[in-house]
Structures are given as structure tokens and as C-alpha cells.
Regions:
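Double-stranded RNA-binding/processing signature
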Residues: 1-131
Length: 131
């Protein structure tokens, strides 16, 4: 549940823990996995084009889209004010929650399950997803 708990909820419901630290870890894990899948899936691509594509995929907008696709928005625990302010639709909230979920997946199962999820998310966008 921590991965889906926004800081506003944790503030209103102590001792609930929020997802910010998990999002920090998830950002790093996601960057590694996306970079690896891009390098393996596009042999001969230069670092410039790989960097641009990775940045597009892991942008706040891109992550929010993936979060919606996975239904993360429906599972978020938000404080009253954040919920009333449209927190479930905020790209930054969704992106952070997805990063936190991926970090929790990594902590529980290592890189393999994260690679599996990210590969599935990348494929509909026409990305090469090897590994």
C-alpha cells in the first residue's frame, strides 16, 4: 500500500507511510530498465537518439499515461484535499506512484518483474523491447 500512498494521505492518516522514497528508487530502476531495453532493442543506435527516446518514455507525461493504462489512478490513496483537487488526474502524482510501484516490485522480486512490466508497456508504443 505504501507505493500507492500519496504524502497527503500519510499526513492525514498517521502512521501511514507515503511513497516518495519508493518513487526515488523507482525512478532509478525505471531509467536502468528502459535504457537496457532500448540498447538491446535498437542495435547501432547512438547515445544521442537513445537518450532522447529514454527521456520521452520516462517523462512525467509518459509515466502518467502508463499509470493510467495499469489502473494506478484508481488505486491511489490520497488525502481529502488532494483528492478534491483532482489528484488522480495529475500527471506528477501518477508518475510518482508508478515509479513507487515499480520500486516495490523491484524490492520484492528483483529486476526481472520490472523488466517484464516495462517491456509490456513499451511494446504498444512500437518500442523494441528485448532483454
Amino acid at each position: 500500500m505504501q507505493a500507492l500512498t500519496h504524502p497527503s494521505y500519510a499526513h492525514e492518516h498517521p502512521p501511514a507511510e507515503h511513497n516518495e522514497t519508493l518513487a526515488f528508487l523507482g525512478d532509478a530502476v525505471l531509467g536502468l530498465v528502459v535504457a537496457d531495453l532500448l540498447v538491446r532493442g535498437t542495435p547501432g543506435a547512438g547515445p544521442g537518439s537513445l537518450t532522447i527516446r529514454r527521456a520521452e518514455l520516462v517523462s512525467t507525461r509518459g509515466l502518467a499515461s502508463w499509470a493510467r493504462e495499469l489502473g494506478v489512478d484508481a488505486c491511489l490513496r490520497l488525502g481529502r484535499g488532494e483528492a478534491q483537487g483532482g489528484g488522480r488526474e495529475k500527471e506528477s502524482v501518477l508518475a510518482s506512484a508508478l515509479e513507487a510501484v515499480l520500486a516495490a516490485l523491484y524490492l520484492d522480486g528483483g529486476l526481472a518483474p520490472v523488466v517484464s512490466v516495462v517491456r509490456q508497456l513499451m511494446e504498444p508504443q512500437g518500442e523494441p523491447a528485448e532483454a
